[in-house]
Amino acid sequence: MIFKFESGASTMHGISRRTFLKTASASAALAAAGVDASWLMANPLGLPLGLQLYSVRDLLPKDYEGTLKQLSAISYREVEAAGFFGRSAGDVKQLMTQAGLRCVSAHYSYPDLAPHLDEVIQFGKTLGLKYIICSSPGVPDGSAAKGADGKVNRDAMTLADWRWNAEQFNRIGERVNSAEIRFGYHNHTGEFRTQDGILLYDEVLRLTDPAKVTMELDCGWMIVGGKNPVDYLERYPTRFSLLHVKDFKMSGKPGSDKEPPPSAELGQGSIDYRPIFAAAKKAAIKHAFIEQEQYDMPPMEALKIDAEYFQALTV
């Protein structure tokens, strides 16, 4: 496995007509909403710079409004939520708008999502979400992957467990999509194991209806799990709508999100995003969210490094 992926494509300092049109459309929409879009061209995907708010999970409970404003000040324009800390959808929307941010997606674990789906959908509609993402799977009653505490061990899930999840995702996706929000699933590393000669993630892709379930590709976790995002973006160019962009200092062999390699700022670890972004530009990616799991410096300093790397990268 080569973690610094090599690309035979030459580096391009311009952008394609397709990327220009996508960028122009997004710029016009943001301008109509009163948001400065002058920064939009300065990144390799021609997309608003996004952040998964799990990256600031320790800061938001202490100063929600201030943290959002700090993120906006270092060029982030879109965010994906990972919890709302007891705030109402209206409150979150107002604070996002005041900070110059748009919350376009939100993560929910399966246990937080399935039993409360009507509430989640209504919250998302009020907030203006485009996506509701299942960030971790569930398991049926009796599954050995469910511990005594009710928590699911993804690395212990069987092929049958994942097939059950695909069925649930189709059901949930139909209901979410009827509210004009897209439903999707976000990977970690446990999906990239093989059982009975079948790669678990591939089985989820096979069994989920693309009209009901889109995919959020976490590039970092896929690589830690031993697979190459470029391969998946090329094989399934219409299945992925969102990316997670993170870096790790890899050991040279596949690992697990349970015992992950050390996190790194973008460009400081082992992952070369140029070929990944080149493949993403040819796929159906609509949003890209930087995410950093851990820090060895103040989070805002690290996230500024991440933002600057992302915006300066050429493919």
State what each model feature region is.
Residues 25, 78, 85, 102, ...:
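Active-site acidic/histidine proton-transfer and metal-coordination neighborhood
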Residues 59-70, 114-123, 225-232, 273:
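Short, acidic/polar
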Residues 13-19, 30-44:
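N-terminal twin-arginine translocation
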Residues 1-15:
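N-terminal secretory signal peptides
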Residues 43-44, 68-73, 87-103, 118-129, ...:
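Acidic (Asp/Glu)-rich catalytic clusters
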Residues 178-270, 277:
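Acidic/histidine-rich catalytic cores of soluble enzymes
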Residues 51, 71, 79, 96, ...:
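Conserved, mostly hydrophobic/aromatic
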Residues 35-62, 69-70:
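C-terminal segment of N-terminal export signals and the immediately downstream linker at the start
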